[in-house]
């Protein structure tokens, strides 16, 4: 790849609040999108997904486009987030993986040895089904509505591979990390091109921003994150940075890791609900200088009713403004501190967006 690459498919956005905020500009309104906004909270999602597995739906262009667009139509959010799953790049590379209802991604064969790492397939090219879906999405979005692509960060993917599926304690992952560090580093290095090529495929198709999700990073100490994870997330974000589009970095339960994660290189840092935004901004700015903040409403507050919800939204917006005024942040994108909970009432999400925009 050249030093700077602007894909031919890249469209020109006009007064797009998400992109303006991510670039440190003043948006026309408080920008908002929600993680997992496309999903089980929407009755229309349940209808179109009926009888189709999660992973299969991620490789069906018309269906993934429809699901991506549903919350934009319903809620008036400022961005669509590509409907996908963090294990899609693994499946596209040829790894045996399924998403089991009520459990999550389950691997046919866990990765436990150096030989397993060497046999792990690498995604070499693009993912045409996803690219076709992105084309359909972009045809419907206005020039003020962004499309955010995403990928799972290497630590989270590595943990799924080593554990063989979801884990409460990540004991096999940490055992490899400390007991067989050579194999651990080999696994992380092998995942990097698969993640980069997945994001490159989305970028080539025309997405407007990317988010790197590190769902399980919050289980790590700062020392372990810095030694065993940071170099690989940094490499991925550096590669994406060559395409000159906003990069968002988010992990769950990572309040104590915000400074370390900010070193990986992104314009936007996602913050979960456990840390006030102004405090999060201080931690980030102390290490990497001021960045744009994203977050951080507790998803459970969408069940609380209009008055307490409004109070929380106003508090979060005030904390973000405090961070900006103090020089610790350069902007704010409103989001949840994690994903929309499956049993959230769709109308309550729409109401939250309206309150945020007001």
Curated annotation (Swiss-Prot):
Subcellular location: Cytoplasm
Keywords from the UniProt entry: Cytoplasm, Decarboxylase, Lyase, Porphyrin biosynthesis
Documented EC number(s): 4.1.1.37
InterPro entries attached to this UniProt entry: UROD/MetE-like_sf, Uroporphyrinogen_deCO2ase_HemE, Uroporphyrinogen_deCOase
Transmembrane stretches, start-end: none
Pathway stated in the Swiss-Prot or TrEMBL entry: Porphyrin-containing compound metabolism; protoporphyrin-IX biosynthesis; coproporphyrinogen-III from 5-aminolevulinate: step 4/4
Binding site for substrate: 36-40, 85, 160, 215, 338
Source taxon at top rank: Bacteria
Pfam families cross-referenced by the UniProt entry: URO-D (PF01208)
GO BP annotations, alphabetical order: protoporphyrinogen IX biosynthetic process
Bridged cysteine pairs (disulfide): none
Catalytic reaction list: uroporphyrinogen III + 4 H(+) = coproporphyrinogen III + 4 CO2
Site feature location: Transition state stabilizer: 85
GO MF terms held by the record: uroporphyrinogen decarboxylase activity
Cellular-component GO terms for this entry: cytosol
Keyword Transmembrane helix included in the entry's annotation: no
Family that this chain belongs to: Belongs to the uroporphyrinogen decarboxylase family.
Record's subunit section: Homodimer.
Function, in words: Catalyzes the decarboxylation of four acetate groups of uroporphyrinogen-III to yield coproporphyrinogen-III.
Protein name as annotated: Uroporphyrinogen decarboxylase
Gene: hemE
